Every structure is written in C-alpha cells, then in structure tokens.
C-alpha cells in the first residue's frame, strides 16, 4: 500500500497543477513562472544527487577504487537516452514556434503534451527504481528516503501541470480539455514506476546503474530545458532564488528522513 501511494504522489502533483486552470483566469505571470521553473530545477538536481547518485555509489562500495563506474556509466547513459528521445520524438516546448524531433503532422497541443511527457519518463523511472530498491530491502534505500524523492518530484510536477494547462486554455481549449491534457502529461510517471517495480527481482543486480541512469536523465531535463527557460528574458535572478529554495528544501527533507531512519 505504501509503495502504491508513493508512486501516485508525483502524478497527484501534476494533477493538482493542471487543476489550477479551473481557478485562475490568466496564465501565470512571468515572474512567478520563472520562480517555479527555478524551484523545479533545484528540486530535481537535489533529488538526482541525494536520492539517486549517492545511493548508487554507496551500493558499489564493494568495487573498491572502481566504485564510481556504475554511477558514471549509468549517468552518461541516462543523458544519452534523453538526448536520443529528444531527437526522435516530435514535441514542442512552450514559447517555441518550431517543434523538435522528427517532422510530423501532429497538432501543436499534442506536441506540447509530448514535450512534458518525454521529460516525465525519467522521473517515473527514478521513483520506480527507488521503491524497487526499498522493496528489495536494500540497506542504502529507506522508505522515508523513497517518499522524500516522490514528494520532491510531486512538488516539481505542480508547476509543470500548471504551465501546460493554462496556456492550452488561453489558446481556446475548454478548461476541462486543458485540465485533461495537463493531467495526461503526467500519467507516464506512475505507469513507468509500476513497470519498474514489477521487474524489481530482475533489476536488483543492476540497481546502481539504474539509479544513476535516472539521475542522468533528470539532470538532462534541467540543463536542456528548465534552466534555459528560466534564464530567458527578465526575472532570471528570481529563477536563481527559486533554484536555491528548491535545492535547500530537498536537502532539509533528505536530512530529516535520515534522522528518522
């Protein structure tokens, strides 16, 4: 039951963010949007380090001086995976007029949802891998640590759902349709997490690689998309403050979890 709840928490964050379309008349002000993007970046970087990379290295201590290999290899593969997906899957980022990936005839709204869905893949994997490690009774992953990651990603997902649904409404879509598309962008997370957990018995031997793989993919999203979007135009300093706040909150949450374990 705890595991099921844990993998649904990030999706709940996306759903709540998308639900803002029922309460807000206009798009989020640029200043607030920059703050949210910076905050999301800080949360994801902190989660990548403390919930994924460090446990990956701790699990590889038996390799002695080569303990860094699983973390390094997995991290690199995670970045390459998202880079490949970015090139192959047609998608459109907010504020951009030209779609990325392979050329296709998909509607603009569909490609907007695909862009966020693409970035939610590693987050779902990250949650699934961590809970799989917890179920496998790995001493380097606690239930509190797994929930800290899940809650952190949910916090990051809230502005994502919001940033998708409000622009869709502004472009003429109904509130319900905008909410549905914003919510749909996050459905890949619980699905990916559940599949990962179901394969737990098979992935345990390569868990360090999978943890760092998820970290690499999440860092790619931050560096490739979130930070550039947060830095463009005015209010870039607000994004930096948001990054610091998100990073510190995740650090405090992680420290609290370690004290309770």
What are these regions (language model features)?
Residues 1-258:
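Intrinsically disordered, metal-sensing/regulatory segments
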């Amino acid at each position: 039951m705890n595991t099921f709840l844990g993998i649904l928490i990030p999706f709940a964050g996306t759903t709540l963010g998308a639900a803002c379309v029922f309460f807000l008349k206009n798009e989020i002000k640029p200043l607030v949007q920059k703050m949210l993007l910076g905050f999301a970046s800080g949360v994801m970087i902190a989660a990548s380090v403390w919930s994924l990379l460090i446990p990956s290295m701790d699990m590889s201590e038996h390799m002695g001086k080569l303990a860094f290999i699983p973390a390094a290899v997995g991290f690199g593969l995670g970045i390459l995976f998202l880079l490949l997906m970015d090139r192959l899957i047609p998608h459109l980022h907010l504020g951009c007029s030209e779609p990325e990936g392979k050329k296709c005839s998909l509607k603009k709204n569909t490609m907007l949802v695909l862009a966020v869905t693409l970035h939610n893949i590693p987050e779902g994997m990250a949650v699934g891998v961590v809970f799989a490690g917890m179920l496998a009774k790995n001493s380097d992953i606690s239930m509190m640590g797994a929930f800290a990651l899940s809650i952190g990603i949910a916090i990051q997902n809230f502005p994502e759902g919001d940033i998708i649904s409000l622009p869709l409404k502004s472009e003429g879509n109904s509130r319900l349709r905008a909410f549905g598309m914003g919510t749909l962008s996050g459905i890949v997370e619980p699905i990916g997490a559940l599949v990962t957990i179901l394969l737990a018995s098979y992935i345990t031997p390569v868990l360090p690689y999978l943890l760092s793989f998820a970290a690499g993919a999440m860092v790619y999203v931050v560096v490739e998309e979130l930070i550039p979007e947060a830095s463009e135009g005015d209010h870039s300093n607000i994004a930096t403050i948001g990054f610091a706040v998100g990073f510190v909150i995740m650090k405090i949450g992680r420290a609290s979890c370690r004290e309770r374990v």
